[in-house]
Amino acid sequence: MSYSQLLLRAWWIVRRHRILWLFGFLAGFAPPSALSQLAGSALTASPEMPQRIRELLVGPSSALLWIGTPLLLIAAFLIWGAINALGHTALIALVNRLEEGEPPTFLTAREAIRGYAGRIFLIHVLLRLPLLMISGIFVLPLAIPILQAMAENRSTIPGPVVDTGLFFCCLGVLIVIPASILITWIEELANRACVLDGRSTFDSIAYGWAAIQQRSGPVIALGIRLLGIAGVAGLFTIVSLNILQGTISRSPAGPLASPFGVKGPWGVLLSFGIAEMAINTWVMTFLSSSWTLFYRQLLMSDRNRSP
């Protein structure tokens, strides 16, 4: 298999067929980092914010906060997964239709979503949720002391407690990052086994794991290449955001004040957020197209050659 030709073909598909961009946006839908940066600035810029957070943690409505926040996070995770599933399902079906010599249409996307989006959603939940829970477990030893200190209006945390929390966070990084890469590869193959072969949810996951075991060399070779491409795009976004933040902080022209008391041109942040989502859309469309081409050329061709 020529990986350069596969990636060039994926590039041509993304550049030529703009209908894919809509579903690439859905597949890669996530809050832009510019929004996270703005929220972080809001928390640190207002001198009253620590006191407000303390009141929320220990005030009369604290029970509602401790119960409602996890439920809200779970609901956000499910909504996010559902939106992503719609995009992934349509992208796989449309790229496959292109490779069969037919034009991609919204009708094809709709039929694929009606038939397979529910299964794709379950695949994502079954693979991502355990990883998310494990990540949370590793963060708890550091997060709990921080929340306790905020609730008790303390500015310091005992050194051994911090060291223990940092140890578990570092251990979690060493475990979660390789696991997330492996799960991503299983998910990509399982998605295509579901949409292109019509497999059930659990059968698709089992097939994705079996395909990695049987064809680990090609899967790893493509996966590392795509991981590098996504990493470069992510690094570009992070560097651009930091440059923008520095430019805003040094701007001599009186910047606008936000409702949180944070100074910063909202128009610039909004523009950057849109640009970030555009880059993420293109990258997600390219990655999905590459995996679909890989699945067709290697795994489906292997099956067709089997007696």
Task: Show where each model-derived region lies.
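Hydrophobic alpha-helical membrane segments
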Residues: 1-307
